[in-house]
Amino acid sequence: MRIGKSSGWLNESVSLEYEHVSPPTRPRDTRRRPRAASDGGLAHLHRRLAVGYAEDTPRTGARSPAPRRPLPVAPASAPPAPSLVPEPPMPVSLPVVSSPRFSAGSSAAITDPFSSLPPTPVLYAMARELKALSDATWQPAVPLPAEPPTDARRGNTVFDEASASSPVIASACPQAFASPPRAPRSARARRARTGGDAWPAPTFLSRPSSSRIGRDVFGKLVALGYSREQIRKLKQESLSEIAKYHTTLTGQGFTHADICRISRRRQSLRVVARNYPELAAALPELTRAHIVDIARQRSGDLALQALLPVATALTAAPLRLSASQIATVAQYGERPAIQALYRLRRKLTRAPLHLTPQQVVAIASHDGGKPALEAVWAKLPVLRGVPYALSTAQVVAIACISGQQALEAIEAHMPTLRQAPHSLSPERVAAIACIGGRSAVEAVRQGLPVKAIRRIRREKAPVAGPPPASLGPTPQELVAVLHFFRAHQQPRQAFVDALAAFQTTRPALLRLLSSVGVTEIEALGGTIPDATERWQRLLGRLGFRPATGAAAPSPDSLQGFAQSLERTLGSPGMAGQSACSPHRKRPAETAIAPRSIRRRPNNAGQPSEPWPDQLAWLQRRKRTARSHIRADSAASVPANLHLGTRAQFTPDRLRAEPGPIMQAHTSPASVSFGSHVAFEPGLPDPGTPTSADLASFEAEPFGVGPLDFHLDWLLQILEA
C-alpha cells in the first residue's frame, strides 16, 4: 500500500473483493489492479473504507500503527489460507443468504471487518452508507423479517428485541460503530439522486397524517351537532381541541356557536373548560358572552388566567369596577392592562391624581393600556403645571386615543409650541396630539405649514353674486406672480425668490405658471413670455393651432391685441382646422345634391339622420337647450367667445332656413365667422360682446363645461 503525493488519498493494491485478493504470504503487489467489469458500487465503497495499514509500512509524521490482520480470502478452487489472527465464529444463520459475492462459505460476511479503526464520524457515515447499499444488493433466499423502523428525526435505525435477536439484521449492522458520535452535517454522505441507484424508502414511526386526523375529527364533530358550515370555518388545529372539550363546555352552558368563537384561540378552550367555575364564583355578573369575547382574542387565555386572582380586588374599593368594565379591560387591554390596573389602582385614584374609575377604565381599555396607565401616573402632575397647563380631562383624552408616546411628545415639545413662532394654545396642542399622536406633534414642532384647503361646490342653478372661487390660484395671485417675475432685477434668481416671497413649493409654483402658459424652463430662468405667446399656447392646449400669418401687435395696446385676436380666430386657416377636409371648389350638382339627399326626410316622415361629424360631436357633448338656439342669434355671438361650440346649428334648422351657409359648403364642424358667413345688417359689432354673450360664455365656453372664472381676470393677466 502506498500514499499518493498529489491527491493525498491511499492507493490500495489489495481489493476487498475476496475472490481476487492474494494470500498474505505472497509478496505485496504495488501495481494498482484495474477495475473489473463486474465491480459495482459495493466494491468501490469497500476500497474507500479499507484504510488499514500493511505490515512494516512506515507512515510519515506519525508513529507506526499496530499490525492489522490481513483480509482472509477463500478462492473458489483452493481451500482458504490460514490467517494470522484467528477469525471469529461465523453466525449460524448466514447460510440463509445466497449471493454470488456473499456465499455461505465466504468470509465476506464478517461482522467486524474494521475493528482496529477508530469510530470517527466520517467512517461511521460511510459504514452506514455501505450497510444500506448492502441491504439493497442482497437477494435473500427466504423471506426476511420486516425492515426495522427508522427514527424520523435522526435517521438512526431503531431495533427492538425481535430485530436484535435476528442474526440477519444483527450481521448487517457493524458492531464497531454501534454508538459512535454523530457526524456533522457537512460530513455526511450524500445520497445518489440517479434513477439507477434507488434507495429503499424508510419507514417512519410517526403519527397519522393531519388530513387523516381531520377526517376522523370531522365525523366526531358532525356527530356532536356541529354543522358543516361551522366546521369549514374552524381552524385545522382547533378541531381536536373542540372534540376534546365539547362535553365540558356544553355542560357549562356554552352553545355550539360560542365554542366555535372561542376556538379562534384554541388554548382558550382548555382554560375556559377548567376555570369557568372559578370565574363564575369570583365575578357572578360575568356572563358567558363576556367570557367568549375575552377568550377569542389573540391572548384571551392569558387574560382569563390573569383575571382569576385579581377579579375580587378590582370589584372592591377603591375602584369598585363592575363585571362589564373588567371584561372590557380584559378584552382590549389583555393581560398587561389587567396587571397594571391591579398594581396602580390605589395610586391612580388617590391624591394627587384623583382619577375616577371611568377614566381609569378608559385609559386601560385599548391596546397599549399598560404603558398608558404608567405614563398618566408619572406625567399627569407635570402636565397640569406650568408651562403645559393641561387639564386632567385633556391628559386622559390624549392617553386614551394616542397613548404613552403622545404624552411624552407633549412633555418634550409643548414649551416650544407655546412660544413664537408657533404660539399654540394648550387646547390646540391637545387636539393635535389626539388627532395625529406623537408624529403630528413632532411635525408641528419642525415647522409643518398649515394650508387652508378650499372646497369648491358646483351649483346646478347660477346664483347672483360674486363668481365662485376657482380651484387653484385666484386671478389676483396669478397677476401678482407674473408681475413679480417681470419686475425682478435678476431673472435667474426670480424663481428662487418667488418661492420665499409667496411661501409655496417648487411643484406648486411650476403648476401655477404652467396654467398661464409658462414652461418649466422659462419659469426656472425667469423669462416670462409676453401675453400673445402665452395666449397662443393656451389655444394650443385647447386643440386650436394658431394661424401662421396672423399679425401680433404689441401687448402694450390692449385694443390692438383684441383686434389681432379676432383676426386670428376668424382666419380661414383656423376655420379649416376644425373641418374634416379643406374646402374645395366643386360643381353645384356635386356639392349640393348629396347634402339635399341627406336632408330629405324619408317616406315614414322620420327626420333625416345627422351628419357624420355632428354624430361624433354629439357623442362627446350632451345636447342642451342652448343647442336649439336660432341661427341668427348664434351668428351674433363674437368669434373670440364661441369658437369651437360646433353644435349651434342643427340639421332641422338648416333645412328650415337654407341660405348662403349651404352654398358656401359649410358644416356644423366648420362654422367660422369669416368670409364664408354674411352677417345681417343692424347686428352689433362682433368684437363687442353683450351681457347675454358673457353669460353664455360663463356657462359653456369651448364645449368643455363651465369655467370658474370670468373674462375680467383674463384681461388682468394679459395686462401683466
UniProtKB/Swiss-Prot annotation:
Keyword list, A-Z: Host nucleus, Repeat, Secreted
Cryptic repeat - repeat coordinates: 286-320
Residues in Cryptic repeat repeats: 321-354
Record motif Nuclear localization signal 1, residues: 185-191
Chain positions of Core repeat repeats: 355-389
Entry's induction text: By hrpB.
Top-rank lineage group of the source organism: Bacteria
Gene Ontology cellular component annotations, sorted alphabetically: extracellular region; host cell nucleus
Chain positions of motif Nuclear localization signal 3: 583-586
InterPro entries: TAL_effector_rpt
Keyword match Repressor: no
Placement of sequence motif Nuclear localization signal 2: 455-458
Motif, Nuclear localization signal 4: chain positions: 620-623
Region span, Disordered: 13-85, 175-205, 571-611
Mapped Cryptic repeat + repeat ranges: 390-423, 424-457
Subcellular location: Secreted; Host nucleus
Predominant localisation class: secreted
Biased composition (Pro residues): 67-85
Record remark: domains: There are at least 4 possible nuclear localization signals, both N- and C-terminal regions contribute to nuclear localization.
Purpose of the protein: Does not activate plant gene transcription, because it has too few core repeats.
Family from the record: Belongs to the transcription activator-like effector (TALE) family. RipTAL/RTL subfamily.
Name of the protein this chain belongs to: TAL effector protein Rip19
